[in-house]
C-alpha cells in the first residue's frame, strides 16, 4: 500500500513500520506521546478497484489486548466501500504477532475503498490483493483536501470504540 495508486492518510511509514508522528519528535513531547506514536489510530489506506475480492495481508508488530476494549480495536481493520461500512477483518483470537491474511468477497464493480488501521496495534506492513485482471486505481479525491489537526483525549479519539473505523 506504500505505492500508487494507494493513498495513505493519517500515518506514514518510518523505520520499518507505520507511525502517527516521527518517533524522535514524539520523544521530545513526553513519554505518553512517544508510547502511542506507533499506534495506528486514524491511519487509512484508500484506493479504487473492480475486483471481486480484497485480500488483506497485515503484518502487525504490536497487539494490545485490553480487558475494556474489543480485540479488533488493536488487531483488526475496517473496510469502507463508497464511504459506507463494508466489513471488519481481524486475526484469530490465538494470534499474537506477525502476519495474517483475510480474503473478503466483493461484487466485481468499481468502488472506492478505505481500509482503516487498528487503533492500538502497530502495523509493520499492509498489503492489499485484488483479483487477476482487476483494475486498481487512485481513490476518489477528498472533497476538501485541506488537512485537519485535532487534539483531544482518548475519549475524543474513540479510545474504546467497538471497531477501528469508529475512532
Predicted regions and their residues:
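N-terminal secretory targeting modules
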Residues: 1-147
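Catalytic nucleophile-elbow at a beta strand-turn-alpha helix junction centered on a G-D-S/GDSL motif
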Residues: 145-165
Amino acid at each position: 500500500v506504500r505505492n500508487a495508486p494507494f493513498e495513505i492518510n493519517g500515518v506514514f511509514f518510518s523505520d520499518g513500520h507505520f507511525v502517527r508522528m516521527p518517533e524522535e519528535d514524539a520523544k521530545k513531547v513526553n513519554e505518553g506521546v512517544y508510547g502511542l506514536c506507533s499506534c495506528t489510530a486514524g491511519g487509512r489506506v484508500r484506493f479504487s478497484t473492480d475486483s471481486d475480492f480484497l485480500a488483506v495481508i497485515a503484518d502487525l508488530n504490536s497487539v494490545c489486548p485490553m480487558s475494556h476494549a474489543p480485540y479488533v480495536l488493536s488487531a483488526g481493520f475496517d473496510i469502507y466501500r463508497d464511504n459506507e461500512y463494508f466489513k471488519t477483518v481481524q486475526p484469530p483470537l490465538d494470534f499474537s504477532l506477525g502476519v495474517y491474511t483475510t480474503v473478503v468477497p466483493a461484487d466485481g464493480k468499481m468502488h472506492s475503498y478505505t481500509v482503516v488501521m487498528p487503533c492500538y496495534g502497530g502495523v509493520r506492513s499492509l498489503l492489499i490483493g485484488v483479483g487477476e485482471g482487476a483494475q486498481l486505481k487512485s481513490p476518489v479525491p477528498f472533497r476538501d483536501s485541506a488537512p485537519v489537526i485535532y487534539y483531544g483525549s482518548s475519549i475524543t479519539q474513540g479510545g474504546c470504540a467497538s471497531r477501528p473505523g469508529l475512532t
